[in-house]
């Protein structure tokens, strides 16, 4: 994280790729992996000078035996120089603005990422703009002048984005300033910023221009766009149009106590085997929750219509489901709300709520309330509360879903009687729905008994003795669990003669809790947050204890891993500072699957989910180096992905898996 510059912003994260791309270097450069070169990439926070000093003292004292006092003095000098540099930049921005006023010049704020200052990347765009007689400023040089009205429609959680929004807000107040945003291919976070910056400017009558640049050194298209902008500005000047400067803040619709009584709450599907149990749990608490059943192709098509197409593939699926349901005509939209979860982390998933609100506004339904379900206090609604009863019902449902998934996927490929595994699942599903759908406080004794009985019944299901390759499925959480997003990969693997192994959904929640340990130890988070989250982990493990013990005693199942063990397995390949997206947890899952004998792994990599490319695809080389028998394939999922290409790559992995299995058996 950065030092907080804007107190009203939601958070102050750094870019997820800036925080983690060094891991790709560490795990893929031969000179480093072979030990020829020393490579240090400690995770550090620029929250304040003390937090930064502590990390650098630990690093340089351990690696180079530099005295603590010397390191702290160096950090202090660097911190002062950083503040001075920023101040000089702001003064220069004010000088340029004054020059524009005195010489009646126009200015262009060239807003981009820090690397866009590099001539090799911007291809000379600043010089081209000045050749037209205009001044060029960076967003950093004027962001301190923009008194941005908050809250925004987006989650303002990345520090660099906060500067972009503030700079755009200042530009809208001046007739002699315009803004051009530079956007590089693959920068998925700019799917959030480009929309928000555009809104800030266009709502106040300004023209928004975005230039997409990549490694191609051809400025023809950029020159045309800039000349078009200048022509449009001249036309507006001749018309002497008066602009109304509008505030940038967004007033969200609150979900009230009255709404709770008769509103239908639409929640997007993520994991059918879990969510079909969560629905009755929420209804028992008085919420009319519905999960729309939307075909996969329709999800994508509708998502592309309502979401910035540079956004990640999971966001298209989520918003596509919601908007398909909203536009279906099945619901009274005057009594409809949307429910979405937010982790509060640096992943763009925290901004899905902004995507949803923008899509609803675009479709003409801005009055539909969007409810955030989160544990970090991001948004609150009087009509939706996580009561102890709802938490109990929901967690029981989640744990039952994990048991069903673990048991069903393990026995179904080997069932002696076709359909018997699904029939057993349906039988127990009805009992679980009746149990978690009870409006009273649930019996923990009965819950424990049901967990044990489910595992025993699946363990005793008649199974064949054949051996099939076990294939783990990991990746981004939605693509991993949602069949519509992963093209029904579990069904595909089973039809091709393999057994699918999908890690528990609860593990992701434990990963979110465990992250507080690293944050408290190295990134300046409070010891209190660490204690609270470790208590939550112990609570989750208490809930899972009976299931874990029964799985350990069974003939066919492995017990669930402890989150601490996953972290220990992962941290020799990636740092536990990787906490964006699935972070170190994704690497840990792959290593745990290999330890359990599922050496064949499909790693689902959705479009624009760049952090997962670092901790997923980016660690495959190192995992193969440590485990030569690992058979891992990374499968890309995006709106235009060819299912044939995905199928071919999976079949190639399976053919290798079958060969390896024959060698093992022989």
Predicted regions and their residues:
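An N-terminal assembly and electron-transfer interface module characteristic of large anaerobic redox
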Residues: 1-666
């Amino acid at each position: 994280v950065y030092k907080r510059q804007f107190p009203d912003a939601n958070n102050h994260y750094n870019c997820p790729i800036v925080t983690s791309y060094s891991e790709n270097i560490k795990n893929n450069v031969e000179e480093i992996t072979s030990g020829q070169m020393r490579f240090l990439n400690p995770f550090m926070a620029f929250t304040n000078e003390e937090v930064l000093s502590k990390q650098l003292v630990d690093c340089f004292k351990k690696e180079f035996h530099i005295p603590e006092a010397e390191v702290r003095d160096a950090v202090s000098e660097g911190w002062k120089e950083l503040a001075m540099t920023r101040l000089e930049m702001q003064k220069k921005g004010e000088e340029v603005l004054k020059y524009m006023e005195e010489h009646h010049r126009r200015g262009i704020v060239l807003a981009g990422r820090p690397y866009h200052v590099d001539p090799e990347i911007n291809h000379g765009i600043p010089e081209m703009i000045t050749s037209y007689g205009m001044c060029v400023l960076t967003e950093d040089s004027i962001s301190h002048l923009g008194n941005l009205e908050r809250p925004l429609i987006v989650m303002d959680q990345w520090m660099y984005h906060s500067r972009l929004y503030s700079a755009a807000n200042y530009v809208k107040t001046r007739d002699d300033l315009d803004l051009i945003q530079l956007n590089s291919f693959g920068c998925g976070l700019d799917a959030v910023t480009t929309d928000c910056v555009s809104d800030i400017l266009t709502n106040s009558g300004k023209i928004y221009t975005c230039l997409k640049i990549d490694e191609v050194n051809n400025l023809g298209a950029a020159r045309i766009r800039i000349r078009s902008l200048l022509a449009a500005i001249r036309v507006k000047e001749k018309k002497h149009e008066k602009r109304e400067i509008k505030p940038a803040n967004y007033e969200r619709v609150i979900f009230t106590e009255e709404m709770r009584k008769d509103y239908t709450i639409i929640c997007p599907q993520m994991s059918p085997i879990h969510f079909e149990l969560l629905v009755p749990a929420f209804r028992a608490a008085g919420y009319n929750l519905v999960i729309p059943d939307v075909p996969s192709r329709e999800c994508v098509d509708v998502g592309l219509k309502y979401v910035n197409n540079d956004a990640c593939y999971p966001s298209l699926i989520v918003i596509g489901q919601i908007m398909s349901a909203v536009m279906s005509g099945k619901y009274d939209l005057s009594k409809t709300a949307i429910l979405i979860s937010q982790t509060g982390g640096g992943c763009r998933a925290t901004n899905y709520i902004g995507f949803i609100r923008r899509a609803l506004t675009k479709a003409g339904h801005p009055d539909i309330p969007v409810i955030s379900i989160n544990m970090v206090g991001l948004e609150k609604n009087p009509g939706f509360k996580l009561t102890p009863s709802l938490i109990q019902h929901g967690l029981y449902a989640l744990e039952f879903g994990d048991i069903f998934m673990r048991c069903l996927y393990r026995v179904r490929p080997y069932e002696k009687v076709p359909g018997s595994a699904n029939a057993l699942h349906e039988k127990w599903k009805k009992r679980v729905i009746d149990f978690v759908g009870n409006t009273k406080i649930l019996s923990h004794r009965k819950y424990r008994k049901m967990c044990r009985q489910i595992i025993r019944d699946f363990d005793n299901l008649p199974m064949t003795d054949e051996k099939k390759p076990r294939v783990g499925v990991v990746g981004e959480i939605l693509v991993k669990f949602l069949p519509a997003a992963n093209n029904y990969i579990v069904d595909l693997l089973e039809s091709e003669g393999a057994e699918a192994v999908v890690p528990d959904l609860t593990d992701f929640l434990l990963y979110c809790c465990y992250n507080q340990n690293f944050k408290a130890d190295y990134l300046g988070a409070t010891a209190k947050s660490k204690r609270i989250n470790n208590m939550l982990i112990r609570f989750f493990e208490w809930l899972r204890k009976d299931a874990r013990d029964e799985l350990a005693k069974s003939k066919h199942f492995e017990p669930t891993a402890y989150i601490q063990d996953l972290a220990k397995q992962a941290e020799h390949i990636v740092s536990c500072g990787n906490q964006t997206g699935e972070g170190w947890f994704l690497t840990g899952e792959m290593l745990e699957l290999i330890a359990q004998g599922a050496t064949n792994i499909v790693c689902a990599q959705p479009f624009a989910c760049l952090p997962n490319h670092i901790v997923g695809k980016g660690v495959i080389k190192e995992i193969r180096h440590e485990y030569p028998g690992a058979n891992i394939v990374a499968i890309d999922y995006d709106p235009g992905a060819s299912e044939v290409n995905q199928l071919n790559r999976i079949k190639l992995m399976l053919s290798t898996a079958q060969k390896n299995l024959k060698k093992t058996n022989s």
